[in-house]
Amino acid sequence: MTIFRFITRRLFRPRTEARSLVLGLWTAAVFSGGFSIGFGGGFGGVAFAQSLNFGGGASDLPIEIYADDGIEWQQENLVFLSRGNARAVRGEVTVFGDELRAYYRENPDGSTDIWRLDAYGKVRIKTAQETAYGKKAIYQIDKGVMVLSGGRVRLVTATDEIFADRQIEYWENKWMAVARGNALAVRKKKRLHADVLAAYFRVDKQGKNKLYRIDAFDRVKIVTDTDTVTSDRAVYNVESGIATLTGSVKLVRGKNVLRGCSAEINLNEGVSKLYSCPATAAGAGKRARGVLRPKRKEQKKVQPIAGPKVQK
């Protein structure tokens, strides 16, 4: 096994925000800062909904790269290749892949910048509390965009799981993560389905990144222990537990079916409110409607009392 160890060197003022929000932020604080060309370059880490700050003093931590089949430095192509059960470790963050690639550029002042990072094969991005799985990961550092794709992409945290058939993206400057293609978010027995899920984060009073809102687009479906609700779009307030659904809303509970233009579902308390369509210039809006089927108690069948047997 080849081991490659180096220390990154920062060439610009460190960022003070906790920028590593979701889905594999492969540390811009490390790679935008460059590396010592004599020792090579490497990979940083990722974190999902973690308060990891790669822009502070942790930027001086060494990055260690391991590869069973060796590490290749292609100077003409300005890229480092790590092959064979490759992994990159920095602090509590590890990137695994069959192959890891770090693309760099040379600046006029002689410094170097890593501008793109790729991972291929059995990609796994692991932090202390989260693990993301896919077959391909690309982080474009200049744009602040990371894309994890390949098969059924999956992200697992202590409380949640997120799946997507197409890809999961992280937009660093927007503090936003997007899951595309038959996306699914699972927490305990609650499930949120949609073609696209967009998750938004912000820093709480403790300085940690916290998920506060999820937007769901197209073929939205929320499933709980008692209800199944479908709509065209939904906005879920994570802190209050309230989901607001709009467009062709349908709520099913047992044999009861309710329909309307919008609905408010409190996922914490199990309370649902359905609303009719507002009136327009063309006329009155559509009313909310429903079919309720009350449960009836099943009557116990009375068994006939057997009389004495008559002997013939």
Q: Where are the model-predicted features located?
A:
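Mature-chain termini and adjacent capping regions
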Residues: 1-12, 18-312
